[in-house]
């Protein structure tokens, strides 16, 4: 039986993910104690071809060794995939503020603040993250986009085409959680120090003109795209659904935006399925 285990940080979207899997034909069980998982999987395998089960922090064992033993037992009998949903700390805090719900660890310990509960959960979930086949950063995904990402990972599409995401980000806001490759461009010339360019972004022509005149910038783009092109065929043969390439500068406004755009457009011109996104630009718009 195909068994999908959905887990992740509280507030990252496990319930949404489980509903999405139910919509594409998985038999779904929400929030099962992990000690019951092998027995339930054996029962379901008699009548179901595929099932999805969500696990949250309250139902995981205290021992990482015990977790390893349970997952090994399942892998010996079933086709297991573990999907871990994640989001950055500020996104989780905002979601809890919007929903006005308590974090599961705050329910167990009312003296625990939301921030402390989020941090404690991250530590406790670390052993499970090590087993994940897919980690999805839900901070920038709509409900529909999360459902589509899950569908493509599990069901694929007719041509099995690798989807490439090239994204810019600012290191001051933290590393992207879903990146396969991270390139740091903070050593390149910075338009921020030019007062006329500071309010602009790497998508605007004056900034493009500023960066494109530097040989170091051109060399970085050239060597980075060559590196990706060298290994892309092997990544495509590895039956991956997504490849996420993250380009980071200090604020995610100038250098990383320009270079991510250049790389993304290059691979689009090569006929690859590429999505370009600029994760930190929205933060600058809201200032």
Curated annotation (Swiss-Prot):
<dbReference type="InterPro" id="IPR053931">
    <property type="entry name" value="RapZ_C"/>
</dbReference>
<feature type="binding site">
    <location>
        <begin position="56"/>
        <end position="59"/>
    </location>
    <ligand>
        <name>GTP</name>
    </ligand>
</feature>
<dbReference type="InterPro" id="IPR053930">
    <property type="entry name" value="RapZ-like_N"/>
</dbReference>
<keyword id="KW-0547">Nucleotide-binding</keyword>
<dbReference type="Pfam" id="PF22740">
    <property type="entry name" value="PapZ_C"/>
</dbReference>
<dbReference type="InterPro" id="IPR027417">
    <property type="entry name" value="P-loop_NTPase"/>
</dbReference>
<dbReference type="GO" id="GO:0005524">
    <property type="term" value="F:ATP binding"/>
</dbReference>
<comment type="function">
    <text>Displays ATPase and GTPase activities.</text>
</comment>
<keyword id="KW-0342">GTP-binding</keyword>
<feature type="binding site">
    <location>
        <begin position="8"/>
        <end position="15"/>
    </location>
    <ligand>
        <name>ATP</name>
    </ligand>
</feature>
<dbReference type="Pfam" id="PF03668">
    <property type="entry name" value="RapZ-like_N"/>
</dbReference>
<keyword id="KW-0067">ATP-binding</keyword>
<dbReference type="GO" id="GO:0005525">
    <property type="term" value="F:GTP binding"/>
</dbReference>
<dbReference type="InterPro" id="IPR005337">
    <property type="entry name" value="RapZ-like"/>
</dbReference>
<protein>
    <recommendedName>
        <fullName>Nucleotide-binding protein Asuc_0930</fullName>
    </recommendedName>
</protein>
<comment type="similarity">
    <text>Belongs to the RapZ-like family.</text>
</comment>
């Amino acid at each position: 039986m195909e068994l999908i285990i959905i887990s992740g940080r509280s507030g990252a979207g496990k319930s949404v993910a489980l509903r999405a899997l139910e919509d594409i034909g998985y038999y779904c069980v929400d929030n099962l104690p992990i000690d019951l998982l092998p027995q339930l999987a054996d029962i379901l395998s008699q009548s179901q071809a595929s099932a999805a089960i969500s696990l949250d922090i309250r139902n995981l064992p205290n021992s990482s060794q015990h977790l390893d033993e349970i997952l090994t037992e399942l892998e010996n009998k079933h086709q297991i995939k573990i999907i871990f949903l994640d989001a950055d700390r500020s996104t989780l805090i905002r979601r809890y503020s919007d929903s006005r719900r308590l974090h599961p660890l705050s329910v167990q310990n009312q003296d625990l603040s939301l921030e402390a509960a989020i941090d404690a959960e991250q530590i406790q979930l670390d052993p499970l993250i090590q087993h994940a086949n897919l980690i999805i950063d839900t901070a920038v995904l709509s409900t529909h986009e999360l459902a589509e990402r899950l569908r493509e990972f599990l069901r694929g599409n007719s041509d099995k085409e690798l989807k490439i995401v090239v994204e810019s980000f600012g290191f001051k806001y933290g590393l992207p959680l879903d990146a396969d490759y991270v390139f740091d461009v903070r050593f390149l010339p910075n338009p921020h120090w030019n007062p006329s360019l500071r309010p602009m972004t790497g998508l605007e022509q004056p900034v493009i003109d500023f960066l494109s005149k530097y040989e170091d910038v051109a060399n970085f783009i050239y060597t980075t795209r060559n590196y990706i092109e060298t290994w892309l065929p092997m990544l495509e043969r590895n039956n991956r659904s997504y490849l996420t390439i993250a380009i980071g500068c200090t604020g995610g406004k100038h250098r990383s935006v320009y270079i991510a755009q250049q790389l993304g457009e290059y691979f689009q011109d090569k006929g690859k399925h590429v999505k370009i996104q600029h994760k930190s630009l929205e933060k600058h718009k809201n200032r």
